[in-house]
Design a protein with these regions (language model features):
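Conserved pre-motif C helix in the palm subdomain of viral-like polymerases
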Residues: 31-61, 153-182
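Active-site-proximal segment of RNA-dependent polymerases
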Residues: 49-107
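Non-catalytic, polymerase-adjacent accessory regions of viral genome-replication enzymes
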Residues: 1-3
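Short, well-structured alpha-helical patches and their helix-loop capping segments
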Residues: 36, 40, 44, 71-75, ...
Length: 239
C-alpha cells in the first residue's frame, strides 16, 4: 500500500521489482518490446516523472515550440499547426526523419550523469533514478519464441513501457532541440520522429548532413539513410 511505499522511500531503501516482458504489434507488422513494471513501481515511477518534470523545467523549456510528444496540452494537433505555420512562412521543403532504435540507443549513463543529476537541487532521489533504469526483466518464459528476440538488447537504453521513459526521451533530446534552434532550423519533433522545413532542396540536404553529424557525435544516435523510396524513413520532399 501507499504508506508502506512511503516508508521505504523515506528511508531510501525502496527497490524496484523485475518488469514483465510484453509485446505489441506495430503498423509495419513487427513488434514493439515493452517492459511493464508492477503496479507499486508504476506509482513510484509516475511520481518520479512529475518530480523530474518540475526539477528539469528550465532544461525542457529549450524544447518549447519544437517538442510535441508526451506533454500536457501538446500533441499531434499542435505539431501539425506548428508545421503549417512554418510552411506558410515559405519554408516548404520538408526533411522528414526518425532516429534508429532510439529508446535502445540512448546512452543512459550520459543521460543520468550529464543531463539529470546536474539539474537536481539535491541527491535524495539519485538512487530511485538509477534503480528505475536498471530494473531486471522478467516474464520472458511466457513469450512466444519469435517474440523473445525483441528483448535481446534489454538493459540497453531506456525501456519502453516505463512511465518515466517518455520524459527521459525528451530530456535526452533537449540538447538536440536547442542545437536546431541555434542553427535556425525550424524543427517539429514528436518523440524520435521529426521534420525540419527549408526554403530549398539544397539547404535541406545540407541540413540533413548537419543533423546526422550532430546526433552521432553528440548523442550517439543515428537517423536512417536519406532515400527516395515510398517506405523510406528519411526523405526530402517538396510540395
Amino acid at each position: 500500500n501507499i504508506s508502506r511505499i512511503n516508508k521505504f522511500l523515506e528511508k531510501g531503501t525502496y527497490r524496484f521489482s523485475s518488469t514483465r516482458a510484453a509485446v505489441i504489434k506495430k503498423d509495419n507488422g513487427k513488434y514493439r518490446p515493452l517492459q511493464i513494471p508492477e503496479i507499486r513501481d508504476r506509482v513510484v515511477l509516475k511520481a518520479l516523472a512529475i518530480l523530474l518534470q518540475l526539477s528539469l523545467k528550465e532544461l525542457l523549456e529549450g524544447s518549447d515550440e519544437i517538442s510535441f510528444a508526451y506533454q500536457k496540452s501538446k500533441g499531434v494537433k499542435q505539431a501539425v499547426l506548428k508545421m503549417k505555420e512554418i510552411f506558410d512562412e515559405g519554408k516548404q521543403i520538408v526533411l522528414k526523419a526518425d532516429i534508429v532504435n532510439f529508446f535502445e540507443e540512448v546512452d543512459k549513463n550520459s543521460l543520468i550523469k550529464n543531463k539529470i543529476f546536474p539539474n537536481l537541487k539535491d541527491r535524495t532521489i539519485d538512487f530511485l533514478i538509477e534503480g528505475a533504469l536498471s530494473q531486471k526483466l522478467g516474464g520472458l518464459n511466457r513469450l512466444h519464441k519469435k517474440h523473445k528476440e525483441y528483448f535481446k538488447n534489454a538493459g540497453k537504453g531506456i525501456p519502453q513501457g516505463n512511465p518515466l521513459s517518455p520524459l527521459l526521451s525528451n530530456i535526452y533530446l533537449a540538447d538536440f532541440d536547442s542545437h536546431m534552434k541555434k542553427q535556425n532550423f525550424p524543427m517539429v519533433r514528436y518523440a524520435d520522429d521529426f521534420i525540419i522545413l527549408f526554403k530549398s532542396e539544397e539547404s535541406a540536404k545540407k541540413g540533413y548532413s548537419i543533423v546526422t553529424k550532430y546526433l552521432l557525435e553528440s548523442l550517439g544516435l543515428k537517423i536512417h539513410e536519406l532515400d527516395t523510396g515510398i517506405e523510406s524513413k528519411t526523405t526530402i520532399t517538396a510540395p
